[in-house]
Amino acid sequence: MNSIEFPLLDQTTQNSVISTTLNDFSNWSRLSSLWPLLYGTSCCFIEFASLIGSRFDFDRYGLVPRSSPRQADLILTAGTVTMKMAPSLVRLYEQMPEPKYVIAMGACTITGGMFSTDSYSTVRGVDKLIPVDVYLPGCPPKPEAIIDAITKLRKKISREIYEDPISFQRENRCFTINHKFHVGYSTYTGNYGQEFFYQPPSTSEIASDTFF
């Protein structure tokens, strides 16, 4: 069920000896034991909760929900993310050990949804805060779509090449409280002071193409 193809795992001998690499073996062990951290804020989370029942039985994928980010390697954001919630979401992501993955579930998480038109406190896309691996559109998405997103993530993990965490290049992530985003570096110390919510400089000091 949901078999994943490995280029180097199909070379077997008559003595049942498997020829593979450490990288493929590590990917194989990780894709069948994803431990998600559920970050649900609205109706999308209810759809995910239905997977726990016997009808869908998401335990067959090796998913074990965790309540601590230090024990999780997958965070699933479901629902609206506001500016006040943004620092806690970034902190949870930074506390997760490498390698870690993100599934953005629902229109409100991906683009802000219906709240993005007239709300001043809604984040227009969680990818402004943390990198997203799989986008799952819908309002809300069905449980079958969630299973499909998890399957796509497992296929992505099976083809990964291990990267040294020290040399891993992180992208610039930032946010402000008034939706005038300015490119800057994330804070990885775990200490979130007033300097994290910096005052955006005037438009005369920044080129127009730096806003998004």
From Swiss-Prot:
One of its GO terms (biological process) is aerobic respiration. GO terms for cellular component: chloroplast thylakoid membrane; respiratory chain complex I. It is found in: Plastid, Chloroplast thylakoid membrane. Binds 1 [4Fe-4S] cluster. GO terms for molecular function: 4 iron, 4 sulfur cluster binding; iron ion binding; NADH dehydrogenase (ubiquinone) activity; quinone binding. InterPro entries: NADH_UbQ_OxRdtase-like_20kDa, NADH_UQ_OxRdtase_20Kd_su. Keywords: 4Fe-4S, Chloroplast, Iron, Iron-sulfur, Membrane, Metal-binding, NAD, NADP, Plastid, Plastoquinone, Quinone, Thylakoid, Translocase, Transport. It is a peripheral membrane protein. Its EC number is 7.1.1.-. [4Fe-4S] cluster binds at residues 43-44, 108, 139. SUPFAM superfamilies: HydA/Nqo6-like. It catalyses: a plastoquinone + NADH + (n+1) H(+)(in) = a plastoquinol + NAD(+) + n H(+)(out); a plastoquinone + NADPH + (n+1) H(+)(in) = a plastoquinol + NADP(+) + n H(+)(out). NDH is composed of at least 16 different subunits, 5 of which are encoded in the nucleus. NDH shuttles electrons from NAD(P)H:plastoquinone, via FMN and iron-sulfur (Fe-S) centers, to quinones in the photosynthetic chain and possibly in a chloroplast respiratory chain. The immediate electron acceptor for the enzyme in this species is believed to be plastoquinone. Couples the redox reaction to proton translocation, and thus conserves the redox energy in a proton gradient. This is NAD(P)H-quinone oxidoreductase subunit K, chloroplastic. It comes from Phaseolus vulgaris. The gene is ndhK.
